[in-house]
């Protein structure tokens, strides 16, 4: 899994050299942000159910047809609503994984690779998840560096979906 630290090491190793001052500064920067990232991951995990439920409501409010259209891709039934919440939870979980490792590797490897195919196969609209993640970003309650760290991965996911 790629992280800023593993990328620096892989680059230096492939060239048979020690880490440069710039690479060491990059690694040090990651360690300085690690506490804030872990605090953000912990807070998002602890508040996950509430954030997911509220984010799903934000999707239903912005896209009311999602609760009116019959079919497996929509939230017109309890099963459909549960699937929507499950999918939002998956995105949020990926954000917490990225916070823990300090890079987009988990999202790139477990989510981005097959995202377009999954959405097309199941007739899912990326705009639903953009709305859900935007809601989470605006309502996670994090402050300072923890918010900055979480928002960077939420933004990454939003951009991938856009």
UniProtKB/Swiss-Prot annotation:
Domain of life of the native organism: Eukaryota
Keywords: Antenna complex, Bile pigment, Chloroplast, Chromophore, Electron transport, Membrane, Photosynthesis, Phycobilisome, Plastid, Thylakoid, Transport
PTM note: Contains one covalently linked phycocyanobilin chromophore.
Topological type in the membrane: Peripheral membrane protein
Pfam families: Phycobilisome (PF00502)
Residues the entry annotates as binding (2R,3E)-phycocyanobilin: 84
Gene Ontology cellular-component terms listed: chloroplast thylakoid membrane; phycobilisome
Gene Ontology terms: biological process: photosynthesis
Family the entry assigns: Belongs to the phycobiliprotein family.
Protein name: C-phycocyanin alpha chain
């Amino acid at each position: 899994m790629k992280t800023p630290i593993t990328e620096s090491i892989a680059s230096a190793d492939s060239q048979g050299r020690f880490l440069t001052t710039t690479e060491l500064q990059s690694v040090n920067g990651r360690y300085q942000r690690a506490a804030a990232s872990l605090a953000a991951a912990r807070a998002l995990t602890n508040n996950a159910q509430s954030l997911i439920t509220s984010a799903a409501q934000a999707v239903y409010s912005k896209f009311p047809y999602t609760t009116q259209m019959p079919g497996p891709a929509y939230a017109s039934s309890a099963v459909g609503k549960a699937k929507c919440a499950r999918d939002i939870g998956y995105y949020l979980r990926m954000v917490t994984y990225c916070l823990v490792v300090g890079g987009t590797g988990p999202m790139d490897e477990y989510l981005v690779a097959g995202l377009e195919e999954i959405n097309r196969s199941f007739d899912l609209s990326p705009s639903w998840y953009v709305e859900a993640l935007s809601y989470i970003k605006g309502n996670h309650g994090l402050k300072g560096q923890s918010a900055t760290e979480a928002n960077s991965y939420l933004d990454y996911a939003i951009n991938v979906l856009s």
